[in-house]
Amino acid sequence: MVKFSREYEASIIPEWKAAFVDYKRLKKLIKRIKVTRRDDSFAAANAAAAADHLLPPPPAEKEAGGYGFSILDPVRAIAARFSAGQQPSASEDEECPDRGELVRSTDKHEREFMERADEELEKVNAFYTGQEAELLARGDALLEQLRILADVKRILADHAAARRARGLARSRSMPPPPPSSSPPSSVHGSSGRYLLSGLSSPQSMSDGSLELQQAQVSEGAAVADEVMAALERNGVSFVGLAGKKDGKTKDGSGKGRGGGGGGGGGVLQLPATVRIDIPATSPGRAALKVWEELVNVLRKDGADPAAAFVHRKKIQHAEKNIRDAFMALYRGLELLKKFSSLNVKAFTKILKKFVKVSEQQRATDLFSEKVKRSPFSSSDKVLQLADEVECIFMKHFTGNDRKVAMKYLKPQQPRNTHMITFLVGLFTGTFVSLFIIYAILAHVSGIFTSTGNSAYMEIVYHVFSMFALISLHIFLYGCNLFMWKNTRINHNFIFDFSSNTALTHRDAFLMSASIMCTVVAALVINLFLKNAGVAYANALPGALLLLSTGVLFCPFDIFYRSTRYCFMRVMRNIIFSPFYKVLMADFFMADQLTSQIPLLRHMEFTACYFMAGSFRTHPYETCTSGQQYKHLAYVISFLPYFWRALQCLRRYLEEGHDINQLANAGKYVSAMVAAAVRFKYAATPTPFWVWMVIISSSGATIYQLYWDFVKDWGFLNPKSKNRWLRNELILKNKSIYYVSMMLNLALRLAWTESVMKIHIGKVESRLLDFSLASLEIIRRGHWNFYRLENEHLNNVGKFRAVKTVPLPFRELETD
């Protein structure tokens, strides 16, 4: 049976660990009380024994040897017993101070326990009430947002129905349309799509005839009036409320902003467009935000009211944001319920232990009643709000389908099966066997000797090294997942991975083992085909590349489809860095790419070799010595650093011009400069460029080491209680951190090999390059653990266990 202390430590929410009952410390206090009471009993027993030794022997024993048995012996025994009862009083008086001190010592520890338990109770109550108030306020805000959204959709649906009715009446008075015209859309009652079908898009404002545009303007004015009236009823203000229907401006005059002097008042100006605040996380949303700002500028200059249209995309994004916010709210409520139940159970268990040790039943009962009356134990507001959120989510977002609603609100964790473990072992054993077979065949064929086939080495090295580096990186990611799980680092929350997207360490090991098994099998088959003289044997690596590409883009729900699609989304965000909001998963993956530059170079050669059809004629020099190839290699060498620098610039603008992001971008710029200098040195190895390589690479390495240790890992803090580390550490053995710093320093200096000019053969040179690339990947996998550990501790320090979703409708000040 698992002890409660272990179960408790394994169940607490990592980000809220400091707010939970310190069960371990209370248990230590109980153990101290137990030890003190045991010492008391031993001291009392020793005092009694000492008192017995101080008693004089009974008179009967004194005289028994000289006088024998007498009928007066009972009388003497009574007298001796009476004198013995009187004499120990002096010894007891002598022992009283010690016993009293021991009793006071025990009372002191019991009092210390009760005071500590009371402090823990106050801490739990304070945290619970704060979180409860925050979640209740968030719930009220979300209900208000949902009410606003419902009003907007209702108004738009009413106007869409009126427009459809007018169109139907107009069509009855007009000749029938030609057969090529599209039929009218059908109404989808519960889907909600029809509610948004009548909204105009920015492009539609300039379409159609003049009469149609005037009709759209007047209709847009009416829609805008009703939408903003509904939103104002819900307490939302707008930018540009200077122009009202009565034509009065801020200064009280009756002229509008565009009003002339004579005839009849100012031009009617509506308030600015409905400000649905959608974060510009993608190019589409960014373009929509730019369009909205342009519309605001035009509105202030007296543009037509058609610019006040609410767009369908904005409503859809607003609805999605509100749905995600409800899911995050429900997640927070579930965590707070878990926080409450675990603390109640912890107090119950620890008080039972205290009663057994101290026998303070009355004090324990009083404290138990205090715990029961505490807000975290007695309040039912969280339970009520959770039930309300379930009903609201089911009604508004899943069409009253409770099963679908629970899939969103309570996503089920995938069950671990032993089949994955079995497949990992199977593929690993197969890989080892095939690798031994390949090593024997390669040795017999002599392909790795100096007199071997250089073309085979040039072709096979690039293609299969690419897969080997990918497999190694996935394997190290699996090691990271294993360590993060054991140390309770909430990596899925940090990366914002859903339950069906996140991999386990077994999944990563399975992917790595299957890739390597397939690669080595292809190596063995390729070697057999070459020795047999089969034509187009070099097409096998291309077939392997085509197979892997097909698996990556496979649309069927096999081979971890959700994870593959998530990977492709992250890669899209990296490639188009300035146009997408930079999330933790995006820049973490971009950092991985900076360690995979050799992999990108291998991909470049492979694409050139097979797309140009070189495997038919074997002129691999086409893809290694061409001028365009060299220029492309130069671009690829610093492309990951360029993407990462763009991400830093995007974060600099988004996070209020944080200077740290500019400094981080400078780190990647220095790496690009060092890569460019090394590339130039490889082309023209002169003494001048040797010194330039040493200077640029040394500067970039110092910059990177500082950022690794201080910013990414949080080390080198001179005021830390852990010397030259940080205050909070997850691993208990501090020497591991010092060794890791030295290892990171050594692996960061791998670039020194490029200036040593070691004279070795072509085969050995290829193997050395592969080894250095592997060491860089190992360094990155080693870096990953401490980077996420530091991020996790930052979340713990801020009690951040639930993501914050920005709300679309926000209150804005008037101009």
UniProtKB/Swiss-Prot annotation:
Name this protein carries in UniProt: Phosphate transporter PHO1-2
Keyword Transmembrane helix: yes
Task of the protein: Involved in the transfer of inorganic phosphate (Pi) from roots to shoots.
Keyword Transport: yes
Membrane topology: Multi-pass membrane protein
Comp. bias intervals (Basic and acidic residues): 97-108, 243-254
UniProt entry keywords in alphabetical sequence: Cell membrane, Membrane, Phosphate transport, Transmembrane, Transmembrane helix, Transport
Induction notes from the record: Not induced by Pi deficiency in roots.
Species per Swiss-Prot/TrEMBL record: Oryza sativa subsp. japonica (Rice)
